[in-house]
């Protein structure tokens, strides 16, 4: 079956973060090179802590973002929730993509955080705030993220999210192998 999407499809992104929006745009245009998309970011709550501190809380945040984006904007063909979190000494993100009939999910690669960053997290709002403090950056979470700092810009938040989003799109790029899983 072809991966082509013919008409303009609205992709509702449950974030206004430029790094997340860039990753979603990149993944969709890569997965569907003949597709035409309109990408719309919306500010919706994750209903979890600003800095989720477990895999399950992070996953729930991504699911909640999709649910809340659907409630906010009923006109989407796709809804994308991305939630970054920490579990132990690693950070990662969950990607959830839904249409009206399908859901795809994937977790990004994980990266270890320095001990001095981990030590400061209990008194911080989000990892990005601690990274800015420790590394002397400003608003890193909306740029390359912790991963760009720790890999000397070999990877960025958007590049790692791009890969995870491509994986979350598998049910949509291979619909003949994935029956509808939403009712």
Curated annotation (Swiss-Prot):
One of the protein's GO biological processes: nucleotide metabolic process
Coiled coil: none
Keywords of this entry: Hydrolase, Magnesium, Manganese, Metal-binding, Nucleotide metabolism, Nucleotide-binding
Cofactor requirement: Mg(2+); Mn(2+)
Family: Belongs to the YjjX NTPase family.
Binding site for substrate: 75-76
Protein name per its UniProtKB record: Inosine/xanthosine triphosphatase
InterPro entries membership: ITPase-like_fam, Non_canon_purine_NTPase, NTPase/PRRC1, YjjX_NTPase
Enzymatic reactions: XTP + H2O = XDP + phosphate + H(+); ITP + H2O = IDP + phosphate + H(+)
Cofactor note: Binds 1 divalent metal cation per subunit; can use either Mg(2+) or Mn(2+).
Residues noted as binding Mg(2+) in the record, renumbered to the chain: 75
Entry function: Phosphatase that hydrolyzes non-canonical purine nucleotides such as XTP and ITP to their respective diphosphate derivatives. Probably excludes non-canonical purines from DNA/RNA precursor pool, thus preventing their incorporation into DNA/RNA and avoiding chromosomal lesions.
Subunit annotation: Homodimer.
GO molecular function: ITPase activity; metal ion binding; nucleotide binding; ribonucleoside triphosphate phosphatase activity
E.C. designation(s): 3.6.1.73
First-tier enzyme category under EC: hydrolase
